[in-house]
């Protein structure tokens, strides 16, 4: 009985650490995301990159789009379209509307990726569908601007791709719906 009790007492700190990690871990990530997002919104891009980079490395969807934006425009980090595209893709496939919209705009502009209005339309449509308020209105304006450059058949293809898309799914090494 004594050995069982001592074993339990020795294991207690480890168990407490696991429980605290489960309880506190998500809020710590949320706090870091809030800090990074606030720094991003204030234009403090070096600080935002410092806060958001570890979150992106751990797969946090909200960090990918903002970091991608910084890499696309060279804000707080060296400008690098391939890095921006990769970050946008990672956020977009996890369902982050900002990353989806920015990925759509990269396809529209042909920054770091081939110009593809159908893919641009698809990602902007998905971003608008997953957003509310002013963000939704902006993404709809972007999508409609892209649509003005498209034929009716291209719009139909873009709509079908958006409807067939599933978060996080890769098909033949490509993002789903491509």
Question: Where are the predicted features?
Answer:
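Bacterial N-terminal signal peptides that target proteins for export
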Residues: 2-16
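Terminal, low-structured helical/coil segments at or just beyond the last alpha-helical repeat
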Residues: 135-178
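Hydrophobic face of amphipathic alpha-helices that form TPR/SEL1-like repeat modules
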Residues: 32-39, 54-55, 64-73, 87, ...
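Alpha-helical segment of the N-proximal tetratricopeptide repeat
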Residues: 31-58, 176
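N-terminal signal peptide c-region/cleavage motif recognized by signal peptidases
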Residues: 25-26
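Short helix-capping/linker turns of helical repeat alpha-solenoids
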Residues: 43-44, 57-61, 73-75, 80, ...
